[in-house]
C-alpha cells in the first residue's frame, strides 16, 4: 500500500511538472499530408498539442513557458524501430540508455529483445516517472533453441501475450513447422510477430504468413541467390553476405511485389551493415563524440569484430549495393520502410546511429520528407496509432523536436537539436547537455 501511494504521488508530480508550453513563430513541419506551416505557433497543454495557429492570432495561456521559434523548425519526434534495451545489470544502465535515446530526439523506440524489466520500464515511462521514449517491446527471443517444437512455440506466444508484450521477436533457427505454429497462434492471440527470417522458412513463407515486419532485410539475399549457391557449399555469412555474388538482381522486382502485397514492413538497419562493410580505416570510432557513452573495452571489442568481418567477407561491397537497390525498389513500390538502425549494437550508438540511418535513406534516393516519414508517420501507422503520435496535429501527444535548421532541405539538420519535448515534458538544449554529461560520467565509472 505504501509503495502504491508513493507511485501515485510520483505520477502526480510528473504530471504537474508539465506547464503549458508555447513555441512561438516557428516553421512547423507537420508530417501531415506534406503541410509545412511558416510563422506559426504551437501550444502544448496537458501533454498534447492543443493548438497550431498563425503567429499573432492567439495568446499564450497564463503560466506558459514561451519558446522563441524564430528561424527554427518544429517536427515530430523520431522513432528508432530496432533498439536494444539492457537488463537490470549494471544497475541504472537501462534507464541511462532510455534517457540517451530521448536526449537525441528519439521519442519512440521498438525494443527488439525484451524481458520482464522492459515491461516495468514501459510502465514507468507512461507514468512520467522516467525520462525516456515511448516504448514498444517484444518478448524474449523465439528461436531454434528456445522453441525447438511447435508446442513450445505456441506456449511462448500465449505466455508473451498474457505478460503484456507488444509483439513477438523471432531470431534464426526456427523449423518451418514451428514457424507455422507460431504464426497461427499469433493470429489467434492477436499479437504480431516480426524480426528475422529463418533459413528453413524463407522470405516467401514469411510474407505469406503476414509477418508484420522483417528486420535487417533478413532472408532477401538468400531469396535472390542462384539455387546452386544454396546447397551449403557457400557459407551464407552475416545476413547473407556470402551469397551476394550469387544474387540474381533481376529477381528483385518479383520480391518487392510480393512484399508489397503482403503488407510487410521493412526495418532495414542499413547503417549496421554499412558500418561493418566499410574499409577498415583505423580510428573509425575515435572521432565520434557519441562513443563517450561506451567503455574503451567495448570499443576495442567492436573494432576487433569488425576487422574479422571485413577480412572474411570479400563480397561485402556487392552486398551493400544489392541491399541499397532492394530498398530503392521497395520504396518506389510503396513498401513501408521503418527507420531502424540496431542500437546500441556494433558501432551503433543511440541517436547517432538513427541520424546516420536517416541520412543513408537520403543517399539511397528517398526525398528528405519521405525519409523523415520512415521515423514518424510510418511508425505510427505501423502500430495503428496515428491518432496518438507521428505528426504535429492538434490533439496528438506532444512529441516535438526544435531544430535550428530545416531537415526538409538537408536530413543532417536533424542533428541540430535545440530541444526535445516528450509528451509535453520540455527539455531545452541546456538540460539535454547536462543529461548527456551525466550519462557519460556514469558510463566511465562502469
Residue ranges and their predicted role:
Residues 394-440:
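C-terminal cap of metal-dependent C-N hydrolases
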Residues 97-116, 132-141, 161-175, 191-194, ...:
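Divalent metal-dependent hydrolysis catalytic cores, especially in the metallo-beta-lactamase
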Residues 26, 42, 47, 71, ...:
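Divalent metal-coordination and catalytic microenvironments
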Residues 26, 308, 315-316, 320, ...:
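C-terminal helical cap
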Residues 72-129, 145-151, 177, 204-210, ...:
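Metal-associated gating/positioning segment near the N- to mid-region
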Amino acid at each position: 500500500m505504501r509503495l502504491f501511494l508513493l507511485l501515485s504521488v510520483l505520477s502526480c508530480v510528473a504530471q504537474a511538472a508539465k506547464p503549458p508550453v508555447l513555441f512561438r513563430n516557428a516553421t512547423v513541419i507537420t508530417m501531415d499530408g506534406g503541410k509545412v506551416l511558416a510563422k506559426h505557433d504551437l501550444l502544448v497543454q496537458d501533454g498534447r498539442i492543443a493548438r497550431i495557429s498563425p503567429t499573432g492570432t492567439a495568446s499564450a495561456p497564463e503560466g506558459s513557458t514561451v519558446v522563441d521559434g524564430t528561424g527554427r523548425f518544429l517536427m515530430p519526434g523520431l522513432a528508432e524501430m530496432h533498439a536494444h534495451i539492457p537488463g537490470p545489470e549494471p544497475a541504472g544502465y537501462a534507464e541511462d540508455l532510455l534517457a540517451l535515446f530521448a536526449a537525441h530526439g528519439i521519442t519512440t523506440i521498438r525494443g527488439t529483445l525484451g524481458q520482464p524489466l522492459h515491461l516495468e520500464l514501459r510502465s514507468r515511462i507512461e507514468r512520467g516517472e522516467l525520462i525516456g521514449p515511448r516504448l514498444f517491446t517484444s518478448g524474449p527471443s523465439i528461436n531454434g533453441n528456445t522453441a525447438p517444437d511447435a508446442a513450445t512455440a505456441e506456449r511462448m506466444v500465449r505466455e508473451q501475450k498474457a505478460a503484456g508484450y507488444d509483439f513477438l521477436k523471432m531470431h534464426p533457427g526456427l523449423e518451418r513447422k514451428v514457424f507455422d505454429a507460431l504464426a497461427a497462434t499469433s493470429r489467434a492471440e492477436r499479437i504480431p510477430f516480426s524480426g528475422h527470417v529463418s533459413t528453413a522458412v524463407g522470405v516467401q513463407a514469411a510474407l505469406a504468413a503476414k509477418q508484420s515486419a522483417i528486420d535487417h532485410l533478413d532472408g532477401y539475399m538468400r531469396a535472390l541467390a542462384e539455387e546452386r549457391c544454396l546447397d551449403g557449399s557457400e557459407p551464407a555469412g552475416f545476413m547473407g553476405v556470402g551469397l551476394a555474388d550469387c544474387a540474381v538482381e533481376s529477381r528483385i522486382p518479383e520480391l518487392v511485389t510480393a512484399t508489397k502485397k503482403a503488407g510487410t514492413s521493412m526495418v532495414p538497419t542499413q547503417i549496421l551493415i554499412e558500418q561493418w562493410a566499410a574499409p577498415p580505416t583505423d580510428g573509425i570510432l575515435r572521432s565520434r563524440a557519441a562513443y563517450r557513452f561506451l567503455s574503451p573495452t567495448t570499443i576495442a571489442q567492436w573494432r576487433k569484430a569488425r576487422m574479422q568481418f571485413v577480412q572474411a567477407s570479400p563480397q561485402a561491397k556487392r552486398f551493400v549495393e544489392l541491399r541499397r537497390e532492394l530498398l530503392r525498389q521497395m520504396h518506389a513500390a510503396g513498401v513501408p520502410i521503418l527507420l531502424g538502425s540496431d542500437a546500441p549494437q556494433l558501432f551503433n550508438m543511440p541517436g547517432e546511429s538513427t541520424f546516420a540511418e536517416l541520412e543513408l535513406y537520403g543517399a539511397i534516393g528517398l526525398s528528405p520528407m519521405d525519409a523523415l516519414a520512415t521515423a514518424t508517420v510510418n511508425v505510427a501507422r505501423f502500430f495503428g496509432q496515428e491518432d496518438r503520435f507521428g505528426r504535429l496535429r492538434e490533439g496528438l501527444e506532444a512529441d516535438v523536436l526544435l531544430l535550428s535548421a530545416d531537415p526538409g532541405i538537408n536530413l543532417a539538420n536533424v542533428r541540430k537539436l535545440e530541444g526535445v519535448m516528450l509528451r509535453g515534458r520540455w527539455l531545452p538544449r541546456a538540460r539535454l547537455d547536462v543529461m548527456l554529461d551525466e550519462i557519460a560520467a556514469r558510463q566511465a565509472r562502469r
